[in-house]
Design a protein with these regions (language model features):
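Helix-loop "lid/cap" segments that line or gate small-molecule binding pockets
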Residues: 45-49, 62-68, 81, 149-153
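Solvent-exposed, amphipathic alpha-helical segments
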Residues: 39, 43-47, 125, 129-132
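Short coil-to-helix segment of the ABC ATPase nucleotide-binding domain corresponding to the Q-loop/switch region
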Residues: 120-121
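Helical hydrophobic small-molecule/effector-binding pocket
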Residues: 51-78, 104, 109-116, 136-139
Length: 157
């Protein structure tokens, strides 16, 4: 905690400023968590506007890998959030599911992805790699897996 408050002070936000806006450390963590989920969810819409459907899906899945990496770093603190604020976690899950379902639906409609693809399977595969303890470079593995998943999701001709 000391390092956290010292590093915030160096960047111009003293602990008093933080606690004026967030009454507790948990409130700050919840705000950060919500913001990260909202950024991930809105990235899906932004990517869909400027990239082809399969490339938008691929790019979003790579952002999802980064999101998981950030969650792993703050996992001990997140356990309190999960226990005390299950509605926050459920709302976040819904936002993430909506984002990937929209991207997959767009890719299916364009004919670039198979019609039998379940978007949650993509997320589950990446989360699974992130939680294998024997993979020290899981992020690189997950990034390679994204390309494998996209290639394997193409329609069979």
């Amino acid at each position: 905690r000391r390092v956290w408050t010292r590093s915030r002070g160096k960047r111009g936000s003293a602990p008093g400023t933080l606690y004026r806006h967030f009454r507790t450390r948990d409130a700050l963590l919840e705000a950060v968590y919500r913001t990260e989920v909202e950024k991930l969810a809105s990235a899906g819409q932004e990517l869909a506007l400027r990239l082809s459907p399969p490339e938008a899906l691929r790019s979003w899945l790579l952002l999802f890998v980064d999101y998981i990496a950030a969650k792993k770093i703050i996992a001990p603190a997140l356990s309190t959030l999960v226990q005390c604020h299950p509605k926050v976690v459920e709302a976040s899950r819904t936002q993430i599911h909506d984002a990937i379902q929209s991207l997959v639906r767009r890719a299916v409609e364009s004919g670039d992805i198979r019609t039998d693809l379940d978007p949650i399977d993509l997320l589950s595969a990446i989360v699974g790699v992130a939680h294998v303890p024997a993979i020290p470079d899981w992020q690189q593995c997950a990034r390679r897996l994204v390309d494998i998943l996209i290639a394997g999701s193409r329609p069979v001709k």
